Amino acid sequence: MSVKHFIQITKPGIIFGNVLSVAGGFFLASKGHVDFALFLAVVIGTSLVVASGCVFNNCIDRDIDHKMERTKNRVMVQGGMSLTLALAYATLLGVAGFSLLYVQANPLAAFCALVGFVVYVGFYSLWLKRKSVHGTLVGSLSGAMPPVIGYCAVSNSFDLAAVTLLVMFSLWQMPHSFAIAIFRFKDYSAANIPVLPVARGILAAKKQIVLYVLAFVLATVMLTLGGYAGLGYLAVAAAMGLYWLYMAWGGYKAEDDSKWARKVFGFSILTVTALSVMMSVDSQTAADVLMTYAR
């Protein structure tokens, strides 16, 4: 056991991705008036909570991770850390993260983090991931919480912008996850995990990817229509979203489903990164009504 194991078991890549979305929500709510001490506390607090969830996930999935090519070398599978130590480590990370969010941000931000944590560890990892094709849908709520945490840490209110962020990032999670399930089809089949491509076929997953990307594109527009983000954000969101939709539609003609799915997955990362950046730099004063720009 080494320091490397303590880092690897937290899934640093997932933490980094969540930091980007936390920052997007935080700066969206800040509207140019940034409290950097608060920002640092929110980023660290959320990262600790996410890390805790990932460690718990590693503990829960240790019996199926050895069946999958991409997870067979994880710390718990290789015996790099005992279950007792991993559970204690996960608990410590969680307590530290929730405490930091509660004390340095506000109870609402901590509550949002708790909801995401419970959904990911309890409903998704412990239950639905192995039992239902709808596990991805439920799990998407946890993946959508980081930008909401960032936003609520500043605004201390769960308003239309927070709802929009929750919907946007939940919708984004679906095609992102389905794409992974397609190019990792053999892994999920071997572990008997009922993700959509395995349970209902790749064609069904392709249809859902197109529908969810379309819904995501429509949802991204709401930040501008609600008066929370500017036209620069709208232009980037529309361009990225429509190209992602075009790419998703191309799945119907794809000769190599795995190659196509990897492209959809890769562009999903670019899309959510671009939107997080744009909502950070092109925020507007919040509107009281939905159709600010439609008057």
Curated annotation (Swiss-Prot):
Transmembrane segments: 9-29, 36-56, 83-103, 108-128, 135-155, 163-183, 209-229, 230-250, 264-284
Domain of life assignment: Bacteria
A GO term from the CC aspect: plasma membrane
More details: Carbon 2 of the heme B porphyrin ring is defined according to the Fischer nomenclature.
Disulfide bonds: none
Pfam families xref list: UbiA
Annotated Gene3D superfamilies: UbiA prenyltransferase
Signal sequence region: none
Catalytic activity: heme b + (2E,6E)-farnesyl diphosphate + H2O = Fe(II)-heme o + diphosphate
NCBIfam families: cyoE_ctaB, PRK04375.1-1
PANTHER family recorded: PROTOHEME IX FARNESYLTRANSFERASE, MITOCHONDRIAL
Compartment annotation: Cell inner membrane
The protein's name in its UniProt record: Protoheme IX farnesyltransferase 2
InterPro entries: Protohaem_IX_farnesylTrfase (IPR006369), UbiA_prenyltransferase (IPR000537), UbiA_prenylTrfase_CS (IPR030470), UbiA_sf (IPR044878)
Family: Belongs to the UbiA prenyltransferase family. Protoheme IX farnesyltransferase subfamily.
Function according to Swiss-Prot or TrEMBL: Converts heme B (protoheme IX) to heme O by substitution of the vinyl group on carbon 2 of heme B porphyrin ring with a hydroxyethyl farnesyl side group.
Gene: cyoE2
Membrane topology: Multi-pass membrane protein
Keywords: Cell inner membrane, Cell membrane, Heme biosynthesis, Membrane, Transferase, Transmembrane, Transmembrane helix
A GO MF term: protoheme IX farnesyltransferase activity
Any GO BP annotation: heme O biosynthetic process
UniProt-listed Enzyme Commission number(s): 2.5.1.141
Organism: Pseudomonas entomophila (strain L48)
Pathway membership: Porphyrin-containing compound metabolism; heme O biosynthesis; heme O from protoheme: step 1/1
